[in-house]
């Protein structure tokens, strides 16, 4: 399955829970929840990394697969937020492409 099809599948799954007829208060409630879920997943990434500056981590290996798994969760919840706001997978992929071009230009100009 292509990545675009997989992203579409995520959006379709989210739509089982995210209704188009939600009130503004309901959208805000779910946007807040999905934001908290995303923050929780980001925190789980931090927990996979050595963080105690006083401890010697020279022999510690990071579980990159566990981190990749948490990043997948971050993206899934992020796509949920996109859906809650009324956008779809094409909207976010276009936004990512546009923002990436802005970021590249900024880096090239010494931003």
Tell what function each PLM region has.
Residues 1-111:
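Flexible "arm" and connector segments at domain edges
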